[in-house]
UniProtKB/Swiss-Prot annotation:
Organism: Campylobacter jejuni subsp. jejuni serotype O:2 (strain ATCC 700819 / NCTC 11168)
Main location: cytoplasm
Positions of transmembrane segments: none
GO biological process per UniProt: arginine biosynthetic process via ornithine; L-arginine biosynthetic process
Name of this protein: Argininosuccinate lyase
Family listed: Belongs to the lyase 1 family. Argininosuccinate lyase subfamily.
EC number of the protein: 4.3.2.1
Keyword Cytoplasm (UniProt): yes
UniProt cross-references to NCBIfam families, sorted A to Z: argH
Subcellular location: Cytoplasm
Pathway membership: Amino-acid biosynthesis; L-arginine biosynthesis; L-arginine from L-ornithine and carbamoyl phosphate: step 3/3
Entry's Gene Ontology cellular component terms: cytosol
Catalysed reactions, as listed in the record: 2-(N(omega)-L-arginino)succinate = fumarate + L-arginine
Disulfide bridges in this chain: none
Amino acid sequence: MKNEMWSGRFSGASDELLKEFNASLNVDKTLFNEDIQGSIAHATMLESCGILKKEELDAIIKGLEQVRSEIEQGKFIFDIKDEDIHMAVEKRLSEIIGSEIGGRLHTARSRNDQVATDFKLFVKKSHIELIKLLKELIQTMLEHAKVHKKTIMPSFTHLQHAQPVSFSFYILAYAFMLMRDIKRLQNSLELADFSPLGSCACAGTSYAINRELSAKILGFKDIMPNAMDGVSDRDFALDLLYDIAVIFTHTSRLCEEMILFSSSEFSFITISDSFSTGSSIMPQKKNPDVCELIRGKTGRVYGNLISLLTIMKALPLAYNKDMQEDKEGIFDSVKTAKDSLIILNAMLKEIQINKENMLNACKKGHLLATDLADYLVREKNIPFRKAHFIVGNVVAQAEAQGIDISEIKDLSKIDPVFDEKAMELLNFEFSLNSKQSEGSSSIASVEKQIQILEGFIQNL
């Protein structure tokens, strides 16, 4: 028996294997809200153009709202034979209001532009949700930054001790990464803000429809100006997947450092018991599973980006069934990102900063060496390369004595070029605040950075 809505030109029914293989309902039913939203906008536009009667529009809207309610309440029966969410909703609508009216909804519309519209609406909504979560995470980082302007810790290059900075300066580096993530999402959202609805299969329609009206109802800035591009475009999905991948690049770096900094070897931070797990055999263990999972999920969202890039590679215009595979990766990446940002924010709110351990760590690795070299250049007019060599010798002498250069009692005994004033440099807080360049680690600079971020999130 032929019962597919598109089966008129076929002489026989589809094989059951094809029905199961071809169906996407188990995945795209996530889009039920967007599908109903798009159909209401389309029907409203058709009525305004005289293609639907007012009573037909009223019946369609009432029926679609009933379908929405049934799905939300778990009463809707999803049948794989319906193939996808679009057909499932339309079939149920026709059952409720009759096929004579229900069958008119798809006038001047193809599933090609319908699915592109639904998908874009979901992607737009996801951008806004992710921006909100990133904003909240930045706010948590700012709270730490305000408290820890004088909490001194070592910075690292090559995971070796580099220079003294404040925890405030450190966490602000991540806050600025997240600020760029928000800007990236905003840019992608702007590029996605064009409606494909009304593009139909690929060439538009002979009906005199008003695409601008349906776009306005759905909250789009404008319409896709080329119908073939309208149904073929998945840049908006790729942009979101890329944006999420970069977010995870940043959060995975933070999580890696939280794992390191919470270890016994560092003990810079303590992760709350509420966000730690134990071992099935080792009673003493306290594992940073939240950070490890976010770090692990990074590979997952990278994979979703590569998957869609590969799906879209070399596809001829316009729509191809390959593009049915575009949604699962998006749904997974969006959920993964939202879940990860929520729990990362909650964990960061409760971390304990171990100030004494951070300060003690500064007494290893000769963090003040660069300050000494800069002093020789600035105060003694010594070329930097020569100053670098002189201070390198100071480091070697300190290591021979088994001490850090911050513990040297008299620099002039190592090299007479150093005077009493140079001894003032062997102080971590002095080093921190001696920086004068924009964006540096000094308290004054950190306060400016906090103001920049606060101004940014206030304007979101």
